């Protein structure tokens, strides 16, 4: 935002330099990125009056002009501008003068004719061609009003000024207007802010007799109003208004369009002006666009609309794309006589989506996207009516045609002086605090020690007590607050939360098992968005992704972990063991926030233990990966169970779901050979757990038991079973009949091949028995073992 000091003085008067003002504003939270001085590098620039113009005798494109510059005699200046003519008031750089770019003006002879100065264009005095009125793009600037020759040209152009360039954070949308900035400056200097005149002399004719307004969806358009002005005269706007627009980075067009832009900058409220006679009806209907509906915007581009777009229509045809750009056939033209002025509040999200999709970013859309101050909507329209009456000879119809509700102008927030003082560490009286709020333009109500601050709608960044505390500290002055030690009502020792503690334990376990922690992108390709997803819900896609590889939010951590493993293997790091704790995302219904769930995932490939002098290497397999998962469950004092499963992307015979309290909380398995080959990986094992689900289980206290004083006993059993029977089913049967002396079991061998029928496999299981109260006898163990074997035989197993 570019803030002209000359313009700012219209609302607030301060006795300070612009550089000091910029420094003070920066110290209170709004960064002044640059200070533009239009008088810099300019010297001896005056207003001149062209008394006569004659063709140069030796150059067709040059003219010899006699110019009155306020001295005893006119000076002769040779000028090549095509639009120079007698009777014009122009900008003249006198001999001895200086222009931007180090240009010095000297007496010269041009093709034999003396020239004592230079008639200047706006570009030559430092104005960007982007902001110069089109009528002066290729020639000198000509004043539209009479001037006094010899007076300071910069003053006549309202360019003897310095402009502050604000680098605003998104929360300070109030400073995107001159009035919002004036409130800030008035607060800093404890002075009054004067608002501009908005009162018009209205006709007896009512706008309600000529126009109706209807809103079809007030969720998208809470409020829409219109006023009507008749008999406007289209002509250039006054010099002072053009200068203010140029200094704000906007090109002047004509008085009607310029007034619309002027009020936008003044109030931060975007307006749109329609040619009333071109609308084609006496009704304005604001609705969402029909799918595939088309309209041509002011830039002569035909746009295809979506139902998410908001359009202003004449009851049938769109005449404007709400908050973004007007339509071509209702625009203000040179012949326009009657004007309809729009002031509205549109849904910020809808405007943002439309402007980004169509790549139509403008001063108006950026303000609608940040939210509009309800207190200024009608006031800005009234200001435009006043300016049209004053500078376009307009006749303002009485009454406002509107639909919807503006909403609250203020938001009350209660706070106490004690709360403020405890936070900033400095004692201010209640009266001092109220004074600061009043300086900001906030009304207050006091009830004992409670201050109710009535925050105006222009300050959308203030919603909670802490925001008010920040305002007090800002306006009082951060540099003026003394350094103090913080005061605490209650001092407690710092400690980790239960979740933080458990998370650290899990990381330590996994790192101790040889895994390295990875952190990967939350964004994946649309194809990978649902890969390995445990919920298979609708994906969350970006509207404008930077690349196809980062187009959707992930539903699993594994796609990027597989990519990381492949990346490492391709660079000769063939033994990869990674884990990640991160968020995945699942969409809910339209308009609802998605679910964000924390997952724990891992990937292992290559050798787990490399071949060393003291032992042989150990290659990663299913049981090793399962052992890593079991370490996690043991550390968290949880008991996992496993159930065979078929999961896309994993080996159909080497995959299991992980259950906790009979609920699926994850899975483990070998990466499908095809997928592994696509990523140049050998046998690779992965696991994924719903970490939130693990954290939500209450495990109570860990009970410690003494080391057994009596010896245990082990028995091995080999079972021939159908190859499709999971070992887990056999273990379940064993534990069901093992009584209280069977402590644990271990599958230590699985065999398929010679000496076995086709479709059969042999599973060897070790059974460990223990009685903590007495020594086990062989007879007692044999009895339990026999019961187990009988149950297994009944299940279809053959004891080998």
UniProtKB/Swiss-Prot annotation:
The protein here is known as Phenylalanine--tRNA ligase beta subunit
Q: What is catalyzed by this enzyme?
A: tRNA(Phe) + L-phenylalanine + ATP = L-phenylalanyl-tRNA(Phe) + AMP + diphosphate + H(+)
The positions annotated for binding Mg(2+) are: 461, 467, 470-471
What is the protein's species of origin? Staphylococcus aureus (strain MSSA476)
Organism lineage reads as: Bacteria, Bacillati, Bacillota, Bacilli, Bacillales
GO terms, molecular function: ATP binding; catalytic activity, acting on a protein; magnesium ion binding; phenylalanine-tRNA ligase activity; transferase activity; tRNA binding
Annotated cofactor note: Binds 2 magnesium ions per tetramer.
* Named cofactor requirement(s): Mg(2+)
Any Pfam family hit: tRNA_bind
| Domain tRNA-binding, residue spans | 39-154
Q: Would you identify the family this protein belongs to, as annotated?
A: Belongs to the phenylalanyl-tRNA synthetase beta subunit family. Type 1 subfamily.
All copies of domain FDX-ACB, residue ranges: 708-800
E.C. number(s) listed in UniProt: 6.1.1.20
């Amino acid at each position: 935002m570019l803030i002209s000091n000359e313009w700012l003085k219209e609302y607030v008067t301060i006795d300070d330099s612009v550089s000091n003002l910029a420094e003070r504003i920066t110290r209170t939270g709004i960064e002044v990125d640059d200070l533009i001085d239009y008088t810099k590098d300019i010297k001896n620039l005056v207003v001149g009056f062209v008394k006569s113009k004659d063709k140069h005798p030796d150059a067709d494109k040059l003219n010899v002009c006699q110019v009155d510059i306020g001295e005893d005699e006119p000076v002769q200046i040779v000028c090549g501008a095509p639009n120079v003519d007698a009777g014009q008031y122009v900008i003249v750089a006198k001999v001895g003068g200086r222009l931007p770019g180090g240009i010095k003006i000297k007496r010269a002879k041009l093709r034999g004719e003396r020239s004592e100065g230079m008639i200047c264009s706006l570009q030559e005095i430092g104005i960007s061609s982007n902001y110069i009125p089109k009528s002066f793009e290729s020639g000198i600037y000509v004043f539209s009003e009479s001037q006094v020759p010899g007076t300071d040209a910069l003053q006549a152009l309202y360019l003897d000024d310095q402009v502050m360039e604000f680098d605003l954070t998104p929360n300070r949308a109030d400073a995107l207007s001159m009035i919002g900035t004036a409130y800030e400056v008035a607060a800093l200097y404890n002075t009054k802010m004067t608002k501009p005149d908005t009162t018009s002399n209205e006709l007896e004719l009512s706008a309600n007799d000529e126009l109706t307004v209807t809103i079809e969806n007030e969720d998208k358009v809470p409020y829409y109003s219109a006023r009507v002005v008749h008999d406007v005269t289209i002509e250039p706007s006054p010099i002072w208004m053009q200068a203010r627009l140029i200094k704000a980075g906007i090109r002047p067009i004509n008085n009607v369009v310029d007034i619309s832009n002027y009020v936008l900058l003044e109030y931060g409220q975007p307006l749109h002006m329609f040619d009333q006679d071109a609308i084609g009806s006496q009704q304005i209907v604001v609705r969402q666009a029909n799918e595939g509906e088309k309209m041509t915007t002011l830039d002569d581009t035909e746009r295809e609309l979506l139902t998410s777009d908001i359009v202003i229509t004449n009851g049938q045809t769109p005449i404007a794309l709400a908050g973004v750009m007007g339509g071509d056939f209702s625009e203000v033209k040179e012949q326009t006589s009657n004007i309809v002025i729009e002031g509205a509040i549109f849904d910020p999200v809808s405007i943002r989506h439309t402007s980004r999709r169509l790549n139509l970013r403008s001063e108006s859309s950026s303000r609608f996207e940040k939210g509009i101050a309800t207190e200024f909507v009608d006031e800005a329209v009234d200001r435009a009516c006043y300016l049209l009456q004053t500078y376009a000879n307009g006749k303002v119809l009485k009454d406002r045609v509107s639909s919807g509700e503006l909403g609250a102008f203020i938001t009350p927030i209660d706070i106490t002086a004690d709360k403020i003082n405890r936070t900033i560490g400095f004692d201010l009286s209640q009266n001092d605090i109220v004074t600061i709020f009043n300086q900001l333009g906030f009304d207050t109500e006091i009830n004992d020690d409670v201050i109710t601050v009535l925050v105006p709608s222009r300050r959308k960044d203030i919603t909670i007590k802490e925001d008010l505390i920040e305002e007090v500290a800002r306006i009082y002055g951060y540099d003026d607050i003394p350094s103090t030690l913080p005061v605490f009502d209650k001092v407690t020792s710092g400690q980790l939360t239960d979740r933080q503690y458990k998370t650290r334990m899990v990381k330590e376990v996994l790192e101790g098992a040889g895994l390295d922690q990875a952190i990967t992108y939350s964004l994946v390709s649309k194809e990978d968005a649902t890969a390995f997803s445990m919920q298979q819900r609708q994906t969350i896609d970006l509207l404008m992704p930077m690349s196809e590889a980062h187009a959707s939010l992930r539903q699993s951590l594994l796609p990027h972990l597989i990519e990381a493993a492949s990346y490492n293997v391709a660079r000769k790091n063939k033994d990869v063991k990674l884990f990640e704790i991160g968020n995945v995302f699942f969409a809910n219904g339209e308009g609802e926030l998605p679910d964000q769930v924390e997952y724990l995932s891992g990937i292992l490939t290559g050798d787990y233990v490399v071949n060393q002098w003291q032992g042989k290497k150990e290659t990663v397999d299913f049981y090793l990966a399962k052992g890593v998962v079991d370490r996690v469950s043991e550390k968290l004092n949880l008991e996992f169970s496993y159930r065979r499963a078929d999961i896309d992307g994993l080996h159909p015979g080497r995959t299991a779901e992980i259950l906790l309290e009979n609920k699926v909380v994850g899975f483990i398995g070998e990466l499908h050979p095809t997928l592994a080959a696509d990523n140049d990986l050998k046998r690779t094992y992965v696991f994924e757990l719903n970490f939130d689900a693990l954290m939500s289980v209450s495990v109570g206290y860990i009970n410690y038991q003494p080391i057994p004083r009596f010896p245990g006993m082990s028995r091995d059993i080999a079972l021939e079973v159908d190859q499709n029977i999971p070992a887990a089913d056999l273990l379940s049967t064993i534990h069901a009949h093992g009584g209280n002396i069977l402590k644990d079991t271990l599958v230590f061998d699985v065999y398929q091949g010679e000496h076995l029928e086709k479709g059969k496999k042999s599973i060897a299981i070790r059974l460990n028995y223990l009685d903590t109260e007495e020594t086990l006898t062989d007879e007692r163990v044999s009895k339990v073992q026999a019961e187990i074997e009988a149950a297994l035989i009944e299940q279809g197993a053959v004891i080998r």
